[in-house]
């Protein structure tokens, strides 16, 4: 959580030319940002559809560590709010494998932050004793560890389609500082290099024990959390005892990350789990990309899925393209935030901020899944005078993390804010198995139903004025006579209010959404892809235009040149031919010069300049929206 190859590659663009490691991507022009207009038309385009969406999720970690021991009525209500169909309807859970400080270290982490590790230290062990643990010795494992977080595993396992385990820090005896809150220098590697194999065995062993004890199947294990940052440090007080940081965390630079991944692959096989490696849960796309670019091919090959956080948002499309080039699924595996100005359960600003962030992640990152950090937060931290004078809006659900076995829902109340409501506009209507599709509006996300007969558009109106939204269905091949669009609106006036279905006329339906609202438009009676929607189309020609220069790529007798629009020499045109059996966002293409019959490629050496060559070698090219 944030504190807060091939020897030849093709390159082309419709609107933007983009190069990516391992493949080149055809990138469709991005729609302009929506201003505070009184009317907007939204066009969902199923010609560009992604792989099946895996769902919505949460990390367990702190809130589960605290509330797993709460009175039954409290924890059951929480579970319903998170996982029931009327709640957030989450179907993905990430279990936190705790590191754990030494037995003689007094707890100094935030409420819930001290997730118990799976090790069992010999009696009398202190922080100075670091060489005793042996992954092969059953006596060094604690099969009853972490009972509170594991209560949640049993409670929700019938609701969960995908399990992931992850680590915030190695156990104290594998760290350089001797504490799980980070090193004394937050920029230095915290895991001892000599402990990489032990760390891998610890994570794999805990994952396999979790599976066996609870009867679940873990899909992936991510050994890192925001590793290449300077967030994680331990501070000692005047008495030499730790006083901060307040959560588990460990800096691991790219080289150490690679060492851990190399060690983890055989450790997983040896443990008996079928879990694969995911990585690296970096804090934002830009840092993720730097880490990933440093990984050699054999390390990348060991990573089954790419995980990124979006606490920073620049570079979303870079990571999207890296995942496509690598042929790997991508998750937005963690984010949270405030998006308000002081704790307020009725203010729409936090809900609108979260909703726009979700739209941007879905549109730009194109993830297979979207996962909350902690939808349940500590009310004591978030109330005015807690972590800040005004308080805050982290989490969609807040309750005190200080409740006791004697408390009830009256004395330990559960509160929800507007983020809980606007999130459900997504989680209720874009479902696992649906496919996210292109949409030409930056305030909207869209998906087609798993069966291909229906769609959903989620639109965010963050302005203080109502807005007329026209849903244009002309990109679908078939729009039935009985097609309808049903708005489901969350605003200050109500939560998920379902309005009467609107009949589709001329392939369009119009509805006026309230100010400061999130609306799910549920579309029935549509299917297929209109012939004029598909890009590229057979026998059509396209310009290749630099996104920064605005100039066109042109083939001449002497090679390739870049010309300004309207320059002498005619209008440069190219043809794009789809190949292979894939469809939608993973379809591969070859780009040819229709006049000369040659294909566009990139030099394998030197300056990697684009060149024309005879159309023969297998292309490696993908389109992105």
Go through each PLM region and give its residues.
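Secretory targeting and sorting signals
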Residues: 1-35
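Carbohydrate-binding surface patches
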Residues: 439-481, 516
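C-terminal beta-strand-rich structural cap/linker in extracellular carbohydrate-active enzymes
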Residues: 502-532
């Amino acid at each position: 959580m944030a504190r807060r190859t091939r020897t030849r590659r093709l390159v082309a663009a419709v609107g933007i030319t983009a190069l990516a490691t391992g493949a080149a991507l055809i990138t469709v022009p991005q729609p302009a940002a929506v201003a505070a207009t009184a009317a907007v038309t939204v066009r969902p385009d199923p010609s560009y559809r992604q792989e099946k969406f895996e769902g919505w999720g949460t990390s367990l970690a702190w809130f589960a560590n605290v509330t797993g021991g709460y009175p039954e009525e409290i924890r059951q209500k929480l579970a319903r709010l998170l996982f029931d169909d009327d709640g957030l309807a989450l179907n993905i859970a990430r279990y936190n494998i705790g590191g754990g400080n030494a037995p003689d270290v007094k707890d100094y982490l935030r409420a819930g932050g001290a997730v118990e590790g799976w090790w069992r230290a010999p009696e009398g062990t202190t922080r100075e004793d670091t060489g005793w643990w042996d992954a092969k010795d059953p006596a060094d494992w604690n099969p009853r560890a972490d009972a509170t977080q594991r209560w949640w595993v049993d409670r929700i396992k019938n609701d969960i389609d995908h399990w992931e385990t992850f680590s915030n820090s190695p156990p104290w005896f594998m760290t350089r500082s001797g504490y799980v809150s980070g090193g004394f220098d937050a920029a230095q590697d915290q895991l001892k290099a000599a402990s990489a194999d032990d760390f891998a065995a610890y994570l794999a062993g805990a994952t396999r024990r979790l599976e066996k004890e609870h009867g679940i199947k873990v899909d992936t294990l991510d050994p890192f959390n925001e590793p290449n940052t300077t967030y994680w440090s331990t501070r000692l007080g005047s008495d030499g005892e730790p006083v901060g940081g307040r959560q588990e965390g460990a800096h691991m630079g790219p080289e150490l990350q690679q060492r851990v991944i190399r060690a983890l692959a055989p450790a997983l096989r040896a443990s008996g789990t079928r879990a694969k490696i995911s990585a690296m849960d970096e804090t934002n796309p830009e840092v993720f990309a730097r880490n990933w670019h440093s990984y050699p091919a054999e390390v990348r090959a060991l990573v089954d899925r790419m995980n990124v956080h979006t606490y920073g948002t620049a570079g979303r499309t870079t990571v999207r393209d890296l995942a496509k080039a690598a042929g790997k699924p991508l998750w937005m595996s963690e984010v949270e935030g405030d998006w308000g100005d002081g704790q307020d359960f009725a203010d729409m600003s936090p809900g609108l901020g979260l909703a726009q962030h979700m739209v941007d992640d879905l549109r730009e990152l194109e993830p297979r899944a979207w996962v909350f950090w902690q939808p349940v937060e500590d009310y004591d931290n978030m109330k005015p005078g807690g972590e800040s004078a005004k308080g805050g809006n982290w989490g969609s659900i807040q309750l005190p993390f200080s409740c006791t076995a004697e408390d009830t829902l009256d004395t330990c109340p559960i509160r929800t804010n507007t983020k809980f409501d606007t999130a459900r506009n997504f989680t209720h209507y874009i479902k696992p198995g649906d496919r996210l599709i292109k949409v030409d509006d930056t305030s909207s996300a869209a998906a087609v139903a798993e069966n291909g007969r229906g769609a959903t558009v989620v639109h965010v109106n963050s302005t203080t004025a109502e807005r007329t939204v026209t849903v244009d269905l002309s990109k679908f091949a078939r729009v039935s006579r009985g097609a309808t669009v049903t708005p489901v609106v969350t605003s200050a006036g109500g939560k998920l209010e379902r309005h009467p279905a609107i009949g589709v006329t001329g392939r369009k339906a119009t509805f006026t959404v309230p100010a400061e609202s999130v609306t799910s438009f549920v579309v029935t009676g549509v299917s297929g892809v209109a012939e004029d929607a598909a890009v590229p189309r057979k026998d059509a020609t396209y310009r290749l235009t630099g996104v920064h220069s605005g100039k066109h790529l042109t083939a001449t007798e002497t090679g390739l040149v870049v010309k300004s629009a309207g320059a002498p020499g005619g209008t440069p045109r190219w043809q794009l031919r789809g190949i292979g059996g894939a469809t939608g966002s993973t379809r591969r293409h070859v780009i040819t010069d229709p006049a000369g019959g040659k294909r566009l490629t990139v030099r394998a050496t030197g300056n990697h300049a684009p060149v024309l060559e005879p159309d023969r070698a297998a292309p490696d090219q993908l389109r992105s929206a």
